[in-house]
Amino acid sequence: MFSFVVKLLFFIYFLITFSNASHIRFGTFKWQPTTQYNEIQFTLDLGFRTSAWFSNLPQKNDFIKISFNFGDNVVSTYQLILTTVDSKDDWFTGTSVFSHTYPTLEVGKTANYTAFYSLCCRISTLLNEKDGDFTIKSLVQIDNSNSLDKINWSPVSGMVPIYPVTYGRNNNFNIPASDQHLRPGEYSNLVFTFGEAKPDGMTLDKNTGMVYFMPSSVGLYCAKVIITDKNGAYITLDFILQSEIQNGFCHHQCNNSGEICTKNSDCINCGNLVYNKTQDACLSTKPIFIYPPTPKPNQTQTFVIGEQNEGFNVSCTTDAIGLNTTIQPVGFPIGFITKILEIGPKSTINLLWFPTSFQDYGTYVKYIVCTDSLIKITTSIEIIIKKPDCSNGGFRDKGICVCPKNFTSESDCLDCSKGYYGEKCIAVPLCVNGVSNSGILGDGKCYCNNGWIGDDCSISNSQSCGSLKSGVVSSSIMEQSYINPVGIQVYLANNQKYQIQVNIKIPEKNKLIDVYFLIDINQNTQNEFNNILSQLNDAKTKILELSPESVSFGLGIIDENGLFADLAKIPSDSIVTSLENKKWSGYNHTITGKSLSAATKAAKTPLGWRTNAFKSMIIIPRTDLPLSPIQTEIDEFKNAFIEKSIAPVVIGINVSLSNWNSTLYQCGFGAYKLSSDAQGWKNFVKTAFKETSSSVLGNGVLQNIIFKVNDNSGGLAFLKSIPENLPIDADIEVVKTLSGLSLSLPINYNSSINPSLRVCTIGYGCIDIKTNYNHPPTPNPFGISCNQNSDAIFQLEGSDPDRNILTFKFTSFLSSTEGLIKTSKGIDVSTQKDELYAGSEKFTFSPYKNYLKSLYISFIADDGCLTSDSSAKVSFSINKVNQPPECSSAIVISEFEKTVDFSFTATDFEDDDQLLILNAQFIVSSELASLEQYGQLTYIGAKVTIDTIIKKSVKILFKQTKNPLNLLVPLTFKSKDSSGLFSNLCTQTINITHTNEAPISNDGTSVTIPRSIGNPLSLLSTDIDSKSAIFTIKKVNAGKTGTFYSCTDNSCSCVAGSNDRIDITDNTKYSQIQYAKNQASLPICFTNSEPSAVPNYAFISFTSTDDEGLESNLATVIVNIVGYRTNVAPVVNKIQDYSVYQDYLDSDAHVVTGTDADIDDYNPQNANNLIAIITNPPSNGILVTVQNGSSIAIQGNAPFTHYYRPNPGYAGTDSYSYQVIDTFNAKSSIESTTITIKPINHKPNVLIDVYKFTSESGDGVIETLNTSDQDGDNVICSVISLPKQILMYDDKGVQIKSVPMVLPNNAYSFKLLDPSIITPTPFSNVLSTFSINCVDDSEKTTPKGVLSTGDVIGNVQYYYINTPPKTNISSVKLSQDSFIAFSFEGSDIESNEKLLKVLLYSLPINGKLSKSIDSNVVLTKELIGGDNTFGLDELTYTPLPGQSNWDTVDHLGPLDRISYSIVDPQGLLSPSSTISFQVRSRNPPIYLGDSDISVLQNTRFPLTIEGELGGGGLSVSIRVLSFSGRGNLSISHSMGKEGFFDKLITEYPSQQLGSTSYNFAYNPPRNQFGSNFDQIQFILFDNDIISKIYNITVNVIHVNQPPATELISYRILNQFEKEIQIDGSTINMNVNDSVLIKIYGSDIDNQTVPLVALVSNLPLRGLIYSFDDNSSDYLGREINHTSQLIPLNEDGYWYVIFIPTKGTTGDNYARVPFNVIDEKGVVSQTSTVIINVNSVNLQPKIYIGSNSNTFVGKVNLTISITNITLDDPDSVNNNISLIVSIVDDNDGDEVLPLSIIKLSFTQATPKCNPNLNLALITCIGSKKSLNASISTISVIGSISGKYRLKLFIDDLGYSAPSTVRAESHLNATGYVNIIINDPIATTQNTDNKTVLSGAIAGASAGAALLVIGLWKMIKRSSPPTDTFFDEGAFMGDVSSSPIYEKSETSYVSRIYEGADD
């Protein structure tokens, strides 16, 4: 319910950051747009020194926190994930990938931002830019003028954190970079330039990025390179280069080819070799990458997201013997997998990556390092991560990606469809009351709306206010605190007191006590001050007795100006020293009574108080307060001590404190003590804490629990009471629970503020209380729209700042003619007007039929306690939708031979009668054909066909021309309105009525009968539409003897003796004679007694009358008499069985006839005149007399022709029977004939209903054709033609693209994909037709085979329903006390944005809306709603003065929110939305720190400027505007465990961002002080909200400065040398000498007595004497432990003489420290002189044997030279060098080649190196080993002549002081003569001198090669150090040969090489 508090606290905590710094090595970042033009993904790569961040070695995937500035006033913190950790070189790399959304732009606009990462500081050991700021930045281009695929991306680069380069050689490498978003056909055009960091001598090719660099120094450089693409986007690459010495060898073209070298300049005379930027003279063997498999730097490795790959291999090898290579990928993304394939001198790894995420997309430039443990090499790799053409397995079809399920083609299958998330695009979980984090980068989590919690946001964390009681919402308990809770949040339900329980825990001894001494240094006398100072340690001891292990101290002073100055924050161990250094300031009478304000200032100052410590300040003023202190000062003092929970203890020394006493009593807390003895005040300190009676409550401050509240607390009105004071007098642990802290809700309170208050105990801590209470809810107005005659579902909405569960009640309702609103249970809300509905209730709005006006209802919100102050409206907008016409079914009755008129009945809401048409093409053709069998259908005089257009108001005529039996003929039809919209199917039924026809009595029948008693006769009547008949005998003429009679039951048998005969007379009637098979027969009898034939003897005439009274014709039956005769019955001829086809009208003619053996007829010419009678008609058909006629065949004269007609549709068998009767009524037998009715194939039928769908229908509904076939055959339908603009699909969803096309399952659907491309008018209706042809699958072939319906036209109708406009919840940001012309977000696919309007439902509460063009028009309730609409850009919002988000309940805003809908030109509303106004407070940050600071003279002062957020502020930044500049002001950077690094501010203004606390350091100028010494002027700002200008005055407090000691010079007395200035602190003297040392002392303070100098510690060796100029040896008294003072000489200097112990030497032989002391006993810093007593190097010697120094031999014979020894008196334990060579006997010293003479001797222990070309051997070794080697020297000459053996010895200067060793080499040279004679038997033609001269000349050319041997030998002989002997080892007295010349660059090792003996 109160979660906003947590948010706010977190927000504030997040702002409290600290300025930290570390040793950064490398950095760069790239950027690229994501799925939105202004959503930019950044990839930041950084490298740091590991130990600056981690105490233990970190691992990959560990992280650190970094802050990044996006350049739009947004700074965010992210995790930098470690990607590479190098434990050897102490660095790591990390990558952070994050996204940022920049402000939106209008279409077509662009914007640029400079994003950057900045950090202090670079490392101090850099050769350039040391301690400089580190900043990498990039120009980020936001582009809303291009499609996403054309928006620019930044370049990308990379580097190793420390790039290895070789000192003194060319180091050429490329800055690897890629233009990562080149489009097809483009080429990279990157430009490379240096940033502000550039090593001296480094050059850069701006087009290629090639770097040329020859380091001139060994160490670390930094370089910054700016890489810019052709669009102006740039990135920064910043890295370190490490210049190291590498051993190498000179190029073969150099004179010293193969010689060991370290830099190019070591190689000389390299001939034609040009070593410039690309070639080196000094070469090294390095490891090398093997190409392939290693990709070359200009090659790219491509990976495709989601696709498998094999990665790539990297291989490296080395030729160095015994070394293996190691390959290290640097900074590769976390997903890379490294597999080691090969280890050894050659190493191979595989780098594999399966990128799966869209985040991986882009280009990477990474480095790989190979090392063989001696030398590192690098290579760069460019990696491109591509999106697949269609990601996630999709494929492209006609330019569109067809994606797997749940992926969208709009993103080329890279993103999920709505409602799916993650890389596999699975469905998001249920999210009931929130928004799911969907999309491929989403995590599927449900982010809950306010008031809901749980994974699916289904659990309400709200409750009704009515169920709430006052109580604790949350509390914070701190176990170590004396008072708990330390923080509490309380909900106040009413104005009843609510008690808060307080727990007090006081341990046996207070665990933590902090005591801060505030001492006034303006004591009357120095003695008083010294007494305070002397007792301070004792006072500490007394307090420590209270809690021996846990007391901390601090110290502040009231200075000579009466101002507070903090000398030592808590905890400090040096408060006594701090006060000693401060000294007494001297009495200042002007500061009387200022201790109260100084104490207040001290209480407000951050002094380092520890959390959970008892806090006390001991105030020792010089004077009492004024008699009547200013009340405001007392209040300020009281509130400051209450707010910080500090217990004041005031101690007066020799002064009355009555006014202090009354002030403490007025405050209600504290203690005071008076001491008449300045030395005894220490005793009162402890009692002030315990056992004192001089306190407000009579006991010590530690024993009082005193509750107080700051008078300025904002929530004071909510506080009803605080606990009473609690005395604690027990020494054991006390735990008590206190009551008395109570709160209540004031009757009148500001409902928009939740105030806080702090209740404190004095010393023991505070309770921070946050109050909450209920606020009225607010109903949210909104609008909904629905289509005409459609429903809309809605829920009521409201907001509540307290997150209460809301219910709602309607306050107005709809009328029955407007519409109906029902609940989810179907209840009309107007029937329960006082019902409260839950917020989850769903209502259904149903407008009255065809109601189109706008409607609204009102409702209020209720939170269980309070009802909203006002109601809100729900506005209903009904979208007019063209309604289809409605047709009606009807029946029309027709009569035979009559004409009837009728109309198709239809109505339409929009159209009048003239516009409503009915098209006969919508009448089923088979129905029309059926009707035409019975009559004629005409319209306006013309026959109705399927092409007839019928208007509603014109009658249709039907004349029934046939008189069938009653039947109904349907006409199925549809109506169509003027828009082409069709109705549903209706039926107009034609009731074909049968008109009754009179029966037919059989007429003209003659019967010939013999004389008999009774002959049967039948009177016949035929009638097809009657059930019975009445036979009426019209006339009877029975002849003379005849009688016609009948029987009573109409069934006479005409046999004799019938007793029921009734004679027939005229007008006799017979009724209820039934028709059977359309025939009715009245049997009668005729009897006569005539003996002879009489023609026309009798007759009977009759009629038959049907059921309806129609009388037939008059029929007469004539009786001929033939008298007595016999008669033979006739024989009937059988008709053979035959067959006919189904539904054919008549068969062929058939005849009933027979034969008669006698002549029956009275008239002979009529002999055999038989009567044929159908005795049993067929059951499934009829017999007719005339083909295609309608007269039923019953009987007739034979031969009787008839035709068989089967009943419609019947197939099978049928039969009929027949006989013939002769004239005597003799009947033949009855025969029957069977007819086979053969089935035929009938034409199938299809009915196509009008297919209707709308723009809101979504995918088309599948429609199935209505087919039928009389024969039961399958009907197969095909599409013959397709509609235009509308796409047709089969029932599988496959589009039908070509015709004819069979329809599977005879089903289809339609879609119209994009209404914007409808022609000629987009977003309009489309009416079109298609045609279907259906065939059956009959197997019949005769008389007809397969039949079709023919092409039947179908109609498809797409009706475009105006789409509601859209809008989004949006937010407008502005600043407090400003206004903004804003735009509503609205769009409509049918309309131009300029045509859209805004319908407002509500107005802002805390601001106003006005028209932008006329600010005087302020909107009121009367000007909104209804027909009042506004343009999207028409309004301006202005918040009330001083109002901002800070004035909302949770301070987070928004300040205002209004509801609205967008209205399109057709009046359709969008769903309602809200626009909120986030009014950023213009409350600037606040500085609450000191405006005056006191700085000790010559002391660095750490100045922390802390700012508080202004109300509603977001950040605190600082801008130092100016600094007066007498001292130095620096930004102080925390370097972690390395302490602080101060960086001097050189330019103003100086700005810092991203923290709330900023560290500076102030350093006063040396030895200057004074009040108002410097001024610091600054502002705090929050983005563009700027505070007032703050000033900090710096007072530099004078502190007695220690004097300074200065070492001036020295003079070696024994040598009468001149005075030598002491450079640094070192003096060099020789063994057995003495030295005079001169020192000087100075003091910046004014001294009244001279300074005193002393030797503070006597040296361990040697003696020190004072100087006595009158003594012959200058020695005065010895300076020893008895007296270490040095007498001051008359010239103002002090002199001492140092004499080392006889015969002893050594570096750092003695250390003599000097100090001077001023009159106040302040001692200077020690100045120590270091004395080196050096030995004296002695000359080495060479001894040639005394016998002879000439040796004679012969050519090619060995001469042994002996008796040569060498000696160096002072080379006992160190080596010396020896060169033995043979030169000619002239004065020259050119060494002879081996081709002339050879030289050798035993090489025992020494390290010797014979030259390969010359007679020369170089050795280094001890005297003993060298003498052993040259005891015998062998010489063999191949040419006779005179030679000299030359020996050169160098003592290497080891016996000289190390500092002058290079200049102290001593050497000696000796010669031995050698004469080589030719053999005696040999004749020599050439002069020896000539030969020898030639040989020598030839050898001269190779003299330079000697150096190679010398270097190699010396190199191998060098001690194992980081340097080596150079040619200085051979310096001597030989100068004629170049090989003996002194090197100008000689140097030697600082480590003595031990002799090898």
Curated annotation (Swiss-Prot):
Keywords: Cell adhesion, Coiled coil, Disulfide bond, EGF-like domain, Glycoprotein, Membrane, Signal, Transmembrane, Transmembrane helix. Residues 1912-1957 are cytoplasmic. Residues 514-705 form the VWFA domain. It is found in: Membrane. Glycans are attached at residues 112, 255, 276, 298, 313, 324, 406, 588, 654, 661, 750, 991, 1188, 1266, 1368, 1528, 1591, 1632, 1646, 1670, 1680, 1756, 1763, 1775, 1827, 1867, 1888. InterPro entries: EGF-like_dom, Ig_SibA-E, Ig_SibA-E_2nd, Ig_SibA-E_3rd, SibA-E_N. GO terms for biological process: cell adhesion. Residues 520-547 form a coiled coil. It is a single-pass type I membrane protein. Interacts with talA/talin. Implicated in cellular adhesion. This is Integrin beta-like protein D. The lineage of its organism: Eukaryota, Amoebozoa, Evosea, Eumycetozoa, Dictyostelia.
